[in-house]
UniProtKB/Swiss-Prot annotation:
InterPro entries the UniProt entry points to: Herpes_capsid (IPR009299)
GO CC, alphabetical: host cell nucleus; viral capsid
Function: Participates in the assembly of the infectious particles by decorating the outer surface of the capsid shell and thus forming a layer between the capsid and the tegument. Complexes composed of the major capsid protein and small capsomere-interacting protein/SCP assemble together in the host cytoplasm and are translocated to the nucleus, where they accumulate and participate in capsid assembly.
Assembly and interaction partners: Interacts with the major capsid protein/MCP.
Cell compartment(s), UniProt: Virion; Host nucleus
Organism: Epstein-Barr virus (strain B95-8)
Signal peptide: none
Family: Belongs to the herpesviridae small capsomere-interacting protein family.
Identification of the protein by name: Small capsomere-interacting protein
Length: 176
């Protein structure tokens, strides 16, 4: 028959019961200010419940998806801006007008420049073939931005086969 371990004696205080808890620094940020003691104790209990549930949820998300959800969203946006800049570099002509292409390329170019700053350390530590492909991608992206701005400056009104831009106010058109 297995012996049961005695239950630990809890004092009801996080810092005394769990001194190595990762919630302790956040929990100690709660200040009493001018609250009565009983109200502050209730606020501490509620805050501890909130911190515990938040911590458990973050662990669950990290176990399920591999990285925290917020970081995934940031990475996804950076990849989309780089992919958008690359798509503009590879598209010779599209259904968008040259002015729209220039605006899209300029907005994608700023996103690509912002996201390329953290990747310089990666490019320096990467193998030569990877770093050369990264630099060629950057060159293609900057070339696309320059080509799109040049096309916008030389716009003759041909339109490139695109649909006309609707300038009517949002609710002005009849519903069909």
């Amino acid at each position: 028959m297995a012996r049961r371990l005695p239950k630990p004696t809890l004092q009801g205080r996080l810092e005394a019961d769990f001194p190595d808890s990762p919630l302790l620094p956040k929990f100690q940020e709660l200040n009493q200010n001018n609250l009565p003691n009983d109200v502050f104790r209730e606020a501490q209990r509620s805050y501890l419940v909130f911190l515990t549930s938040q911590f458990c949820y973050e662990e669950y998300v990290q176990r399920t998806f591999g990285v925290p959800r917020r970081q995934r969203a940031i990475d996804k946006r950076q990849r989309a801006s780089v992919a958008g800049a690359g798509a503009h570099a590879h598209l010779g002509g599209s259904s968008a007008t040259p002015v729209q292409q220039a605006q899209a390329a300029a907005s994608a170019g700023t996103g690509a420049l912002a996201s390329s700053a953290p990747s310089t350390a990666v490019a320096q530590s990467a193998t030569p073939s990877v770093s050369s492909s990264i630099s060629s991608l950057r060159a293609a992206t900057s070339g696309a931005t320059a080509a799109a701005s040049a096309a916008a400056a030389v716009d003759t009104g041909s339109g490139g086969g695109g649909q006309p831009h609707d300038t009517a106010p949002r609710g002005a058109r009849k519903k069909q």
